[in-house]
């Protein structure tokens, strides 16, 4: 009889403990935060990366536009002036500094014949922080068909950047991430073709 009573008391005690345990809400907020915090942090960093990438892409377009505008305002130009303009263009990307842009300035003349050809007259390039010769003189340049007017002269400026996010991956991580690893570098580029404003063409004596 006593054994049965004691067993019943223990069962009730256990049942009460379980009910209290199930009904206890202490620490729920901490557990929920621990579960949702990684998701919130991921969303924050993704949003930050997307915003920075969009802003940097706009700046690349601004670089090409500004450089083309400055060059086409000249009646003639020299290598030192071209290099200075490209260096000014590079500073537009500040404070982004995780990779360096490539800026190409190419003077193009469309031949005046039955089959017009876009021919490079001179070309300069800024790459890896240094300047040098771009496309070979006399080579064929790629321009839109709408601009292939016989006897015309164009300045083509292209800006390129391999955008690197704040969070980047190692080679081993890229291979394991698969498609996600492709976001380690985002290629951005913009090209502008403008005509000279002050003269028919813009010669460069020492390019």
Name these PLM-found stretches.
Residues 1-26:
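N-terminal leader/signal peptides at the extreme start of proteins
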Residues 2-4, 65-207:
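Short, conserved structural patches
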Residues 16, 24, 41, 150-152:
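Alpha-helical hydrophobic/aromatic positions enriched in membrane-embedded helices and signal peptides
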Residues 24-39, 49:
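N-terminal signal-anchor/signal peptide hydrophobic helix marking the start
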Residues 28, 43-75:
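Aliphatic-rich helix starts adjacent to a transmembrane/signal segment
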Residues 40, 57, 168-170:
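Short, function-defining helix-loop hinge/capping sites that tune catalysis or transport
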């Amino acid at each position: 009889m006593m054994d049965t009573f004691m067993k019943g008391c223990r069962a009730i005690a256990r049942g009460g403990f379980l009910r209290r345990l199930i009904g206890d809400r202490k620490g729920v907020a901490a557990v929920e935060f621990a579960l949702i915090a990684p998701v919130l942090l991921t969303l924050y960093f993704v949003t930050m990366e997307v915003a920075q990438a969009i802003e940097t892409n706009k700046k690349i377009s601004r670089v090409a536009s500004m450089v083309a505008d400055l060059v086409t305002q000249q009646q003639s130009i020299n290598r030192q002036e071209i290099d200075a303009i490209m260096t000014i263009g590079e500073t537009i990307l500040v404070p982004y500094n995780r990779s360096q842009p490539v800026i190409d300035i190419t003077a193009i003349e469309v031949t005046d014949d039955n089959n017009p050809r876009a021919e490079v007259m001179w070309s300069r390039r800024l790459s890896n922080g240094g300047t040098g010769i771009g496309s070979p003189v006399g080579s064929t340049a790629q321009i839109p068909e709408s601009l292939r007017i016989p006897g015309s002269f164009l300045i083509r400026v292209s800006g390129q950047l391999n955008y690197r996010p704040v969070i980047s991956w190692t080679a081993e991580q890229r291979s394991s991430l698969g498609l996600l690893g492709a976001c380690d570098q985002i290629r951005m580029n913009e090209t502008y073709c403008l005509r000279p404003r002050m003269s028919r063409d813009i010669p460069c004596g020492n390019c």
